């Protein structure tokens, strides 16, 4: 027998190398085969409910890292709730209607307008479902636990029916109306857009300063006076029907030197405008308040059939332009709102494809709207005073990445103004993480206009509206309920397969259709109405879920998206929010803080990460970042996270190895019988349990990450485990000293494995497979630990905190001795502590082997007054380091005066000799194979 065989060197097959890319799919297959999601739900039956509602990602393409951040975050929350006494099902969903799918088919050469609509819609449906399958596999590869066999998809007939019921309820309350207000119009999509479908980019535009000649000055302005206006959208001059001034603003009539014309501009902008127009000097003829100019009539710059009225508007400012805004009610929200007050014509001169219409005039007809600036300049002639290129923020279609325009076309709207205050009241009842989300959503709802819900596309849920012969829109409860039932049985495809009369209730009549003829709406609903109805189609429809949901968790862009649309529909129908709490997260940027894009080549694919590092590394990254703000990720950052993971894994591997001979049923030592330092570690660990428990409840994953990393690296690796080896390796296998430490090891190992399961499920499942005495087959079926508190806990923590300060001081003294070549390793040291009475009292109170804790072979405690001049001194304490006396024990590696060669061929100290002689009699009898001496 070899001497080292008398040591209790921890043994385990648990590998240091994780090999996550290969092992994770094996664990996922095992979970699926064991039906773990179902079993966890069964375990939680009857417990308090926690229901997170999954905001549906769009079913198109593989997932990106933003999806991963979102789904992993949700999984962490649901897993932690499931293991903490809550019935917490997780039903994933997908958004499956909308333009992107039509665009994919168009790129494949499929022409919607040249084929049967029902056939086209079925192609859209099949493509969407194929993308659901693709993304489902991607999410499962991340280890997300969910009801994958029963997700919700917005194209499902049941969901479509419930969506129609939401629409019908809003219509019944009078919240649905038709209007011709200007809406965001995407010529590239040939459809109206909602605010949530808009993104802004900085672009360069040609702005024009031009003048309208006064036709009827109402006794205030002469007819040789010109009112100067400014536009950044020259094409809209074709539809200009008014000039808006600020009622309380001051306007001057000026006559430039050498000109026979006089011009009206805002007083506050005159100096800057004079420079732009080349007016070296001018004469001020008069001053007027904007309100004085109301109802003055001007000529259109070139259209002799059009007069433009001077009107008043509060939206006019002195920030730019001339203080006078040309007003085209068909091309702007402010223009429309102020124009309708004065009954201005709502002229629209651009068609759905962005081409100028016939009513724009023969010079413009058929031209693309963004290319007509030279024609406008030519038509203005000498009325043009200046032109310049400006850089400004402009709205774009978020899908096609093309600029959009405001365009007044007949659309269906959901009123928000009718119940806006009710929505705002509900926001104030909602909990927000982070708290600033409340103000953000509140302001968005407060300031938003009514919601345009119609779209001029094909792939979506039809607006269930019929028209009588006299044009009356029909959307009564009887009709919408009937359509909902048809959709539930057949899907919304039936809308396109049947005539209007076959979609109406049998025997339906209407006074507006004396001949019994009806037509149906051909527009579809905004896809935000789809997902915005999910509270009804999912949470209110499934028996194992509840409405309102406990939590909605999405990116911060959803304040204007899903959070917004869901809130509007829910309050409209039921008077309350669809959620009790909202958690929003920032965007995922690359390592430099830049937006990810294919063109930059900086996209991080979750699938690539899973192949290179493993999903648990991506999950640990999610826990490591502050998602209240934008977060960064790169392969380098993930490499750093992987290194942290390695430290955690190897620390837990040490605990596994050194509890391999520990049976918790027979070997556990009661807390009261633990050593002082073991009690301290038990208290510290339970504080960690409390911290993690609280952080899970607050959805603060980063706090968990920081606490775990600190505990593993500082409390365990750098302290407890550093000296624990000298006990668990060296003391007799069944000794009290060793079993005490193993008790703490095992307690930490089991509980931290449970605590980390929501974040690192693959790794903790692998650890759990080595814990043979734990009854649950999978750690996911276990319950979270509950933090304990102990007698005199605060006093114990205070004493050990003081010791940690002493330990740091001692390490500095040892380091100086090492640098002075007095010692090599700290075990070569004889450390003398010159202590004040206060420090002596502390060391006595610790009731511990201080030499063991400081990892020195010999320790002496002396009076502070006896400290030599060359001692390493601190307040109330000093240290002297000398080389320890004696020989190195071959077994304990400590220097001990009692170390000598024994009769059984072992060069060991008395303490090791006693352990050998009591526990290895055969080796003593036969002698050890070899000795270094």
Swiss-Prot record:
Keyword list, A-Z: Aminoacyl-tRNA synthetase, ATP-binding, Cytoplasm, Ligase, Nucleotide-binding, Protein biosynthesis
One GO BP: isoleucyl-tRNA aminoacylation
One GO cellular component term: cytosol
Residues binding L-isoleucyl-5'-AMP, per UniProt: 554
Single Gene Ontology MF annotation: tRNA binding
SUPFAM superfamilies from the UniProt entry: Anticodon-binding domain of a subclass of class I aminoacyl-tRNA synthetases (SSF47323), Nucleotidylyl transferase (SSF52374), ValRS/IleRS/LeuRS editing domain (SSF50677)
Binding site for ATP: 598
Reaction catalysed by this enzyme: tRNA(Ile) + L-isoleucine + ATP = L-isoleucyl-tRNA(Ile) + AMP + diphosphate
Keyword check for RNA-binding: no
Annotated compartments: Cytoplasm
Pfam families noted in UniProt: Anticodon_1, tRNA-synt_1
Motif ('HIGH' region): 57-67
This protein's record includes keyword Transcription: no
Motif, 'KMSKS' region: chain positions: 595-599
EC numbers: 6.1.1.5
Family recorded in the similarity comment: Belongs to the class-I aminoacyl-tRNA synthetase family. IleS type 1 subfamily.
Domain-level remarks: IleRS has two distinct active sites: one for aminoacylation and one for editing. The misactivated valine is translocated from the active site to the editing site, which sterically excludes the correctly activated isoleucine. The single editing site contains two valyl binding pockets, one specific for each substrate (Val-AMP or Val-tRNA(Ile)).
SUBUNIT field: Monomer.
Family annotation (PANTHER family): ISOLEUCINE--TRNA LIGASE, MITOCHONDRIAL, SOLEUCYL-TRNA SYNTHETASE
Function: Catalyzes the attachment of isoleucine to tRNA(Ile). As IleRS can inadvertently accommodate and process structurally similar amino acids such as valine, to avoid such errors it has two additional distinct tRNA(Ile)-dependent editing activities. One activity is designated as 'pretransfer' editing and involves the hydrolysis of activated Val-AMP. The other activity is designated 'posttransfer' editing and involves deacylation of mischarged Val-tRNA(Ile).
Name of the protein this chain belongs to: Isoleucine--tRNA ligase
Lineage: Bacteria, Bacillati, Bacillota, Bacilli, Lactobacillales
């Amino acid at each position: 027998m070899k001497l080292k065989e008398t040591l209790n060197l921890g043994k385990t097959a648990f590998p240091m190398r994780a090999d996550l890319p290969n092992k994770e799919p094996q664990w996922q297959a095992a979970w699926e085969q064991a039906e773990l999601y179902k079993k966890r739900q069964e375990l939680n039956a009857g417990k308090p409910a926690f229901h997170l509602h999954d905001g549906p990602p769009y079913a198109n393409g593989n997932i990106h890292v933003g999806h991963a951040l979102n789904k992993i975050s949700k999984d962490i929350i649901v897993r932690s709730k499931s293991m903490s006494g809550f019935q917490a099902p997780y039903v994933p969903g997908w958004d499956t209607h909308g333009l992107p799918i039509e665009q994919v088919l168009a790129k494949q050469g499929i022409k919607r307008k040249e084929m049967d609509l029902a056939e086209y819609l079925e192609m859209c449906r099949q493509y969407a479902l194929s993308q659901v399958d693709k993304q489902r596999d991607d999410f499962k590869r991340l280890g997300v636990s969910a009801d994958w066999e029963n997700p919700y998809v917005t194209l499902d007939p049941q969901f479509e029916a419930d969506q129609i019921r939401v629409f019908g309820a809003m219509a019944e309350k009078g919240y649905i109306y038709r209007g011709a207000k200007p809406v965001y119009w995407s010529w590239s999509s040939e459809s109206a857009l909602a605010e949530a479908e808009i993104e802004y980019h900085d672009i360069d535009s040609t702005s024009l300063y031009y003048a309208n000649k006064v036709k009827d000055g109402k006794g205030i302005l002469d007819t040789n006076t010109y009112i100067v206006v400014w536009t950044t959208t020259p094409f809209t001059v074709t539809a200009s029907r008014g000039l808006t001034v600020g009622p309380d603003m001051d306007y001057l009539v000026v006559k430039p030197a050498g000109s026979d014309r006089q011009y009206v501009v805002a007083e506050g902008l005159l100096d800057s405008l004079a420079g732009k127009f080349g007016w070296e000097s001018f004469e001020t003829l008069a001053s007027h308040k904007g309100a004085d100019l109301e109802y003055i009539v001007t000529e259109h710059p070139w259209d002799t059939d059009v007069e433009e009225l001077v009107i008043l508007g509060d939206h006019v400012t002195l920030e730019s332009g001339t203080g006078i805004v040309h007003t085209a009610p068909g091309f702007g929200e402010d223009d429309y709102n102020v124009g309708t007050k004065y009954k201005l014509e709502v002229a629209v001169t651009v068609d759905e494809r962005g081409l100028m219409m016939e009513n724009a005039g023969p010079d413009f007809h058929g031209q693309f709207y963004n290319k007509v600036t030279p024609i406008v300049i030519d038509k203005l002639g000498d009325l043009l005073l200046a032109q310049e290129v400006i850089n400004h923020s402009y709205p774009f279609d978020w899908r096609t990445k093309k600029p959009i325009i405001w365009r007044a076309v007949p659309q269906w709207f959901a009123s928000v103004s009718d119940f806006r205050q009710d929505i705002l009241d509900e926001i104030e009842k909602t909990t927000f993480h982070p708290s600033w989300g409340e103000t953000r959503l509140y302001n968005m709802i407060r300031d938003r206009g009514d919601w345009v819900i119609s779209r001029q596309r094909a792939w979506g849920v039809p607006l269930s509206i019929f028209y009588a012969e006299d044009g009356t829109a029909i959307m009564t409860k009887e009709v919408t309920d009937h359509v909902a039932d048809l959709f539930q049985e057949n899907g919304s495809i039936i809308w396109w397969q049947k005539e209007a009369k076959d979609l109406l209730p049998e025997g339906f009549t209407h006074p507006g259709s004396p001949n019994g003829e009806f037509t149906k709406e051909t527009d579809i609903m905004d896809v935000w109405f789809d997902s915005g109805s999910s509270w009804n189609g999912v949470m209110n429809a499934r028996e194992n879920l509840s409405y309102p949901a406990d939590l909605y968790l999405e990116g911060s862009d959803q304040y204007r998206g899903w959070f917004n649309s869901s809130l509007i529909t829910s309050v409209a129908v039921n008077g309350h929010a669809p959620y009790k709490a909202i958690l929003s997260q920032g965007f995922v940027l690359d390592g430099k803080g830049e937006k990810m894009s294919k063109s930059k080549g900086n996209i991080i694919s979750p699938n690539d990460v899973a192949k290179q590092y493993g999903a648990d590394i991506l999950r640990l990254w999610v826990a490591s970042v502050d998602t209240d703000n934008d977060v960064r990720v790169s392969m380098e950052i993930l490499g750093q996270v992987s290194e942290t993971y390695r430290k955690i894994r190897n620390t837990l591997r040490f605990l596994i190895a050194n509890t391999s001979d520990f049976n918790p049923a027979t070997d556990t030592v009661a807390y009261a019988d633990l050593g002082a330092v073991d009690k301290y570690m038990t208290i510290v660990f339970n504080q960690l349990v409390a911290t993690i428990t609280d952080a899970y409840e607050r959805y603060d994953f980063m706090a968990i990450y920081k606490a775990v990393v600190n505990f593993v690296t500082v409390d365990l690796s750098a302290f407890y485990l550093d000296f624990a080896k000298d006990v668990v390796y060296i003391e007799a296998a069944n000794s009290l000293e060793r079993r005490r430490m193993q008790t703490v090891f095992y307690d930490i190992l089991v509980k931290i494995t449970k605590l980390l399961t929501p974040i690192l499920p693959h790794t903790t499942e692998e650890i759990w497979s080595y814990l043979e005495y734990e009854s649950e087959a999978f750690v996911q079926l276990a319950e979270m630990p509950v933090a304990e508190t102990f007698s005199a806990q605060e006093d114990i923590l205070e004493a050990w905190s003081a010791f940690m300060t002493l330990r740091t001081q001692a390490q500095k003294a040892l380091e100086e001795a090492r640098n002075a070549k007095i010692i090599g390793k700290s075990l070569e040291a004889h450390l003398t502590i010159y202590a004040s009475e206060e420090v002596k009292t502390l060391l006595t109170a610790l009731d511990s082997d201080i030499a063991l804790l400081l990892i020195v072979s010999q320790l002496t405690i002396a009076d502070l007054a006896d400290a030599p001049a060359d001692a390493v001194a601190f307040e109330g304490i000093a240290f002297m380091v000398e080389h320890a006396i004696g020989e190195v024990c071959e077994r304990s590696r400590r220097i001990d005066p009692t170390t000598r060669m024994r009769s059984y061929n072992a060069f060991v100290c008395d303490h090791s000799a006693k352990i050998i002689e009591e526990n290895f009699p055969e080796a003593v009898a036969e002698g050890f194979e070899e000795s270094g001496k």
